[in-house]
Amino acid sequence: MISARFSGRQGDFTLDAAFDVPGQGVTALFGPSGCGKTTVLRCMAGLTRLPGGHLVVNGVTWQEGRQITPPHRRAVGYVFQEASLFTHLSVRENLVYGLRRARGPLRISEAEVTQLLGIDPLLRRPTATLSGGERQRVAIGRALLSQPELLLMDEPLSALDRISRDEILPYLERLHASLQMPVILVSHDLSEVERLADTLVLMEAGRVRAAGPIAAMQADPNLPLIHRPDLAAVIEGVVIALDPAYGLSTLQVPGGRIVVPGNLGPIGARRRLRVPATDVSLGRHAPTDTTILNALPAVILGAEAAEGYQITVRLALGASGEGASLLARVSRKSFDLLGFQPGEQVVARLKAMALSAPAQTGG
């Protein structure tokens, strides 16, 4: 468990943020620019000191009021927006620098880091010859090799162009699946958060609006996320079948099975799906003579008005609503004509080609 409380003023900005999140997996601090995300991250690293603070990381106290463990005595890896590499050193020499800074036991080896981040071919190269995405991967590798108990990442993709972001995201997803250490990720990009985070801390104007599992936060009618035009549900599943003849994979998810384009193998691999709410339609019966491959039983939990004469319908997969959360954005007219009610069992139809899952980088 990570328990954090930080309060105080910095110039004209007042921070009063508190949250408790799991001591493993990826937690995203999400919110608009200037809401205090980076300030919280710097407090966790010990780089910013606010006397009204409290920080316990998996049973180890790093701050209790004015008793503050200095940064160099915290087992923290910090990845900045800009990859701050030593330009006079090679890639491998930058990584070795991280190893030399290690304070605790060996949690991850150089070989594991280079394999996870795909930087083996770069080891002999000068850092000046690297692309933006390659530089950031090396910076992450160096932070990991310092053997941290906590990895802090301050908008690690914000300085990259779209091509470089698309290059590095699959490697971050591999880290997410492989690392045991907790990661705190600062981001204002919801699509990035949906791909990487398990837990979401929603911040507004220096305060924490809410915190919890990302799927629950997306579907919470009391939070602003549910009103976003790019609303989507995040669903975790396990690959149970591959269909190479048609280029499809089948995932078992809580409450049903979903067919997805692409080879997401191997069998048994855990994958995360992003299901856009606008690509989910509802009916009372399973469709026939249709191109839609996914028709899953679901239960309506509730509905909220959305912009443009639309309705956002909150659902739970499964005949009894025992499965994963799902969201559908439908026209108000169709919703009223069909007379859907909370508690009613319906069939959720998902367009397979609209579903997206992480690209695989091998292994």
UniProtKB/Swiss-Prot annotation:
Membrane topology, as annotated: Peripheral membrane protein
EC number: 7.3.2.5
Keyword terms of this UniProt record: ATP-binding, Cell inner membrane, Cell membrane, Membrane, Molybdenum, Nucleotide-binding, Translocase, Transport
InterPro entries for this protein: AAA+_ATPase (IPR003593), ABC_transporter-like_ATP-bd (IPR003439), ABC_transporter-like_CS (IPR017871), Mo/tungstate-bd_C_term_dom (IPR008995), ModC_ABC_ATP-bd (IPR011868), Molybdenum_import_ModC (IPR050334), Mop_domain (IPR004606), P-loop_NTPase (IPR027417)
A GO cellular-component term linked to this record: plasma membrane
Pfam families (UniProt xref): ABC_tran (PF00005), TOBE (PF03459)
Catalytic activity: molybdate(out) + ATP + H2O = molybdate(in) + ADP + phosphate + H(+)
Statement: the UniProt record of this protein carries the keyword Membrane: yes
Segments forming domain ABC transporter: 1-230
Domain of life of the native organism: Bacteria
Main localization (coarse): membrane
Mop domain mapped to chain residues: 289-359
Record-linked SMART domains: AAA
Binding-site list for ATP: 31-38
Enzyme type, top EC level: translocase
A GO term for molecular function: ATP hydrolysis activity
Location(s), subcellular: Cell inner membrane
PANTHER family xrefs: ABC TRANSPORTER I FAMILY MEMBER 10, MOLYBDENUM IMPORT ATP-BINDING PROTEIN MODC 2
Known partners and oligomeric status: The complex is composed of two ATP-binding proteins (ModC), two transmembrane proteins (ModB) and a solute-binding protein (ModA).
Similarity section: Belongs to the ABC transporter superfamily. Molybdate importer (TC 3.A.1.8) family.
Function: Part of the ABC transporter complex ModABC involved in molybdenum import. Responsible for energy coupling to the transport system.
Protein name per its UniProtKB record: Molybdenum import ATP-binding protein ModC
